[in-house]
């Protein structure tokens, strides 16, 4: 059965390109895994797939199994140990702060990704397809990928409302249900709704209004709006400066009668993380290259081999997305 093992499907939509939709998708996926959920990310931005680059796995390739295509693993689930359970019980007897630490220390879920970027021979190859071929590719992604047991499947979509969105909506409404009563073994996956991503500017929020109308016309519930790039946080003093404006997404959500999930200022640390740089790297690229050359010659190059999810916990934006993840879990699972 297509989408077998998937419990909930969330679409990530945006009206315009460049609002950070793919980075929001990834951060929400990482935050959900840190809540103990197994997560899949399906990238259907066929002409501009970003997920392989963001997770640092551009060289990965899709493998085939008897059940279908196997998604690329970003990190595996962390098993709960007996000693971990004992520690949790011991700490829970001490009260307040310790209980919060135990809650944060819950075993993380797995994260897997599927993208056309993994199927291209070269990452620079252009995808020049007409609508019917895009539609066929999206249907194949939805029917031929074996996700296994997955709590949440996040679908990273292209900006706007294009052929991809129409094909996705039509196929998902056949393969899933929007009813919250769909539970149990053999039940259809639940299309829980869409998260809309915008920046504060009016030119972006005006296009997100079209996404809200798209959801209404296709009977896809709207879970909420995230206002991305809502200011810049100085890494030295922590002061937030509004580079563009602020509050546009919140005003739009209120006017459209949609839940406003929150604002996310620009996180320089997350940008460095997905670009493969450390926070301490110099802004002077020439000096940086020279230093790396010397370190390589000395064999002293430091490579942080921790999983992406563990390094992400050090980004201050993790706190924002942890809140979004908890809100969505509470809304969806009750």
Swiss-Prot record:
<comment type="similarity">
    <text>Belongs to the Mrp/NBP35 ATP-binding proteins family. NUBP2/CFD1 subfamily.</text>
</comment>
<comment type="subunit">
    <text>Heterotetramer of 2 nbp35 and 2 cfd1 chains.</text>
</comment>
<dbReference type="GO" id="GO:0002098">
    <property type="term" value="P:tRNA wobble uridine modification"/>
</dbReference>
<feature type="binding site">
    <location>
        <position position="234"/>
    </location>
    <ligand>
        <name>[4Fe-4S] cluster</name>
    </ligand>
</feature>
<dbReference type="GO" id="GO:0016226">
    <property type="term" value="P:iron-sulfur cluster assembly"/>
</dbReference>
<feature type="binding site">
    <location>
        <position position="237"/>
    </location>
    <ligand>
        <name>[4Fe-4S] cluster</name>
    </ligand>
</feature>
<protein>
    <recommendedName>
        <fullName>Cytosolic Fe-S cluster assembly factor cfd1</fullName>
    </recommendedName>
</protein>
<keyword id="KW-0547">Nucleotide-binding</keyword>
<dbReference type="GO" id="GO:0005524">
    <property type="term" value="F:ATP binding"/>
</dbReference>
<dbReference type="GO" id="GO:1904564">
    <property type="term" value="C:cytosolic [4Fe-4S] assembly scaffold complex"/>
</dbReference>
<keyword id="KW-0963">Cytoplasm</keyword>
<keyword id="KW-0411">Iron-sulfur</keyword>
<dbReference type="GO" id="GO:0051536">
    <property type="term" value="F:iron-sulfur cluster binding"/>
</dbReference>
<dbReference type="Pfam" id="PF10609">
    <property type="entry name" value="ParA"/>
</dbReference>
<keyword id="KW-0067">ATP-binding</keyword>
<keyword id="KW-0004">4Fe-4S</keyword>
<keyword id="KW-0408">Iron</keyword>
<comment type="function">
    <text>Component of the cytosolic iron-sulfur (Fe/S) protein assembly (CIA) machinery. Required for maturation of extramitochondrial Fe-S proteins. The nbp35-cfd1 heterotetramer forms a Fe-S scaffold complex, mediating the de novo assembly of an Fe-S cluster and its transfer to target apoproteins.</text>
</comment>
<dbReference type="GO" id="GO:0046872">
    <property type="term" value="F:metal ion binding"/>
</dbReference>
<dbReference type="InterPro" id="IPR028600">
    <property type="entry name" value="NUBP2/Cfd1_eukaryotes"/>
</dbReference>
<feature type="compositionally biased region" description="Basic and acidic residues">
    <location>
        <begin position="289"/>
        <end position="302"/>
    </location>
</feature>
<feature type="binding site">
    <location>
        <begin position="15"/>
        <end position="22"/>
    </location>
    <ligand>
        <name>ATP</name>
    </ligand>
</feature>
<dbReference type="GO" id="GO:0140663">
    <property type="term" value="F:ATP-dependent FeS chaperone activity"/>
</dbReference>
<dbReference type="GO" id="GO:0051539">
    <property type="term" value="F:4 iron, 4 sulfur cluster binding"/>
</dbReference>
<feature type="region of interest" description="Disordered">
    <location>
        <begin position="274"/>
        <end position="302"/>
    </location>
</feature>
<dbReference type="GO" id="GO:0005829">
    <property type="term" value="C:cytosol"/>
</dbReference>
<keyword id="KW-0479">Metal-binding</keyword>
<dbReference type="InterPro" id="IPR033756">
    <property type="entry name" value="YlxH/NBP35"/>
</dbReference>
<dbReference type="InterPro" id="IPR019591">
    <property type="entry name" value="Mrp/NBP35_ATP-bd"/>
</dbReference>
<dbReference type="GO" id="GO:0016887">
    <property type="term" value="F:ATP hydrolysis activity"/>
</dbReference>
<dbReference type="InterPro" id="IPR027417">
    <property type="entry name" value="P-loop_NTPase"/>
</dbReference>
């Amino acid at each position: 059965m297509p989408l077998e093992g998937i419990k909930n499907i969330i679409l990530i939509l945006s009206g315009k390109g460049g609002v950070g939709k793919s980075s929001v998708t990834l951060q929400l996926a990482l935050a959900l895994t840190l809540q103990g959920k197994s997560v899949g990310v399906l990238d259907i931005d066929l002409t501009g797939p970003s997920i392989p680059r963001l997770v640092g796995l551009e060289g990965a390739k899709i493998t085939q199994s008897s059940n279908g295509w196997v998604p690329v693993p970003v990190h595996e689930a962390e098993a709960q140990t007996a000693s971990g359970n004992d520690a949790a019980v011991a700490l829970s007897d001490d009260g307040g702060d310790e209980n919060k630490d135990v809650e944060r220390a819950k075993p993380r879920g797995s994260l897997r990704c599927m993208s056309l970027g993994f199927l291209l021979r070269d990452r620079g190859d252009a995808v020049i397809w007409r609508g019917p071929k895009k539609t066929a590719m999206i249907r194949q992604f939805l029917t031929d990928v074996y996700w296994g047991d997955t709590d949440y499947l996040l679908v990273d979509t292209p900006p706007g409302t294009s052929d991809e969105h129409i094909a996705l909506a039509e196929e998902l409404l056949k393969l899933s249900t929007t009813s919250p009563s769909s539970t149990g073994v053999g039940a259809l996956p639940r299309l829980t709704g869409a998260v809309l991503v915008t920046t504060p500017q009016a030119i972006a929020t005006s296009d997100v209004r079209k996404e809200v109308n798209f959801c209404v016309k296709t009977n896809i519930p709207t879970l909420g709006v995230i206002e991305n790039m809502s200011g810049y946080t100085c890494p030295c003093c922590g002061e937030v400066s509004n580079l563009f404006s602020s509050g546009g997404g919140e005003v739009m959500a209120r006017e459209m009668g949609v839940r406003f999930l929150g604002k996310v200022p620009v996180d320089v640390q997350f940008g460095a993380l997905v670009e493969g740089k450390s926070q301490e790297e110099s802004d002077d690229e020439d000096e940086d290259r020279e230093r790396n050359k010397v370190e390589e010659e000395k064999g002293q190059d430091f490579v942080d081999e921790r999983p992406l999810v563990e390094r992400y916990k050090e980004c201050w934006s993790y706190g924002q997305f942890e809140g979004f993840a908890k809100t969505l879990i509470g809304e969806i699972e009750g």
